[in-house]
């Protein structure tokens, strides 16, 4: 769950807090504020807004250290954040819309090539995929604190494993192996297709996975 609310310091389980931390959502820098990295939530309260944001760890799809525009924390939420007056656009019509795409642009059946249609469908799928997530950056004034923030986030997220990836007694080992490969491909796609330096994201889990594969 992601809540837009007045954020107070957690009473229990606080691992890290710091002031002068900028939060960037998508292409927008929301402002500067205080971050609270706790066992159950990742929260940020801006200094110039009444409300902040509180995020349960299960909503964080991945996190790591980015170097663009400078060393900072990058993390991705598994859905689109709507923060009234701050971030998030209302749903837009039509997605085939380089020109605002109306129905007339989609009626050209039989005259266009199948290859062109497949390209359009792929681009629409990519747009839809990234429309369902929110890319976020925590940018501290002191970049030397990034490693400490990353360590605290890793510790907290490890306390909340994704239930969808948990082992099952009825699971098929071959299917499980395929699932791991699919997950790796999805993460690679996210790193490749992401914006604003996401391709520079360093994830320890990925590095260990590839090292194990080499062995």
From Swiss-Prot:
Disulfide bonds: none annotated. Residues 88-120, 160-215 are annotated as: Disordered. It comes from Drosophila melanogaster (Fruit fly). It comes from the Eukaryota. Pfam families: Voldacs. One of its GO terms (biological process) is cell volume homeostasis. Coiled coil: none annotated. This is Methylosome subunit pICln. The keyword Nucleus applies. The keyword Flavoprotein does not apply. Component of the methylosome, a 20S complex containing at least CLNS1A/pICln, PRMT5/SKB1 and WDR77/MEP50; may mediate SNRPD1 and SNRPD3 methylation. Forms a 6S pICln-Sm complex composed of CLNS1A/pICln, SNRPD1, SNRPD2, SNRPE, SNRPF and SNRPG; ring-like structure where CLNS1A/pICln mimics additional Sm proteins and which is unable to assemble into the core snRNP. Residues 105-120, 167-190, 203-215 have a biased composition (Acidic residues). PANTHER family: CHLORIDE CONDUCTANCE REGULATORY PROTEIN ICLN, METHYLOSOME SUBUNIT PICLN. Its main location: cytoplasm. InterPro entries: ICln, ICln/Lot5/Saf5, PH-like_dom_sf. It is found in: Cytoplasm, Cytosol; Nucleus; Cytoplasm, Cytoskeleton. Keywords: Chaperone, Cytoplasm, Cytoskeleton, mRNA processing, mRNA splicing, Nucleus. Belongs to the pICln (TC 1.A.47) family. Involved in both the assembly of spliceosomal snRNPs and the methylation of Sm proteins. Chaperone that regulates the assembly of spliceosomal U1, U2, U4 and U5 small nuclear ribonucleoproteins (snRNPs), the building blocks of the spliceosome, and thereby plays an important role in the splicing of cellular pre-mRNAs. Most spliceosomal snRNPs contain a common set of Sm proteins SNRPB, SNRPD1, SNRPD2, SNRPD3, SNRPE, SNRPF and SNRPG that assemble in a heptameric protein ring on the Sm site of the small nuclear RNA to form the core snRNP (Sm core).
